[in-house]
């Protein structure tokens, strides 16, 4: 008669400890982003949301996809928020950072054209054609365009990572987010789920590898010239 097989308690304990370690390592970047951005973010909702946003030099609007010459709905919301910030005197410039790695795909120009149609003057807009990801956009805002204080504009699920990366890049940063789940729930939840991996990569880029942007330079004076102009 075969005896009962007893579980290997030591093996089970090690497996449990390994699972705990993996869970901690997986959640550590999210915790880093959340804690580092606490007190430096607000949602663009409610009648008084602009009153919760400090004045900075520029709104750093991060690209979020375009359909030909039209911004995606999420990007359009970011641009609407940036327009509100500009008209309220919360920022003096709009730094439009996005992907133009292919001739037929041009996020910054599409962003500019959308804002131009809303009445934002060209003189207030600066285009960064090499904002290929959030880290590149933040680093280039400081090292290429010379920004010191920015209000980064994106969706709520992205705000902790965006604010934390810009602060790590050396920018004094406040973030304003759009609660996209009210309009596009399924898309928002899908993007939010991807934040776990995206934040892990961001942590590696910013804290471990100290990655350089794809295009680290040269220095541009376009933002400086906008800020040197007298307020409108």
Annotate each predicted stretch with a short phrase.
Residues 189-212:
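A transmembrane-helix-recognition feature enriched in membrane-embedded lipid enzymes
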Residues 1-53, 214-221:
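N-terminal membrane-anchoring alpha-helices
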Residues 102-107, 174, 196-203, 220-225:
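A general structural signal for short secondary-structure boundary/capping elements
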Residues 210-232:
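Short linear elements at protein peripheries
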Residues 2, 6, 33-193:
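A structural signal for short, hydrophobic/glycine-enriched beta-strand patches
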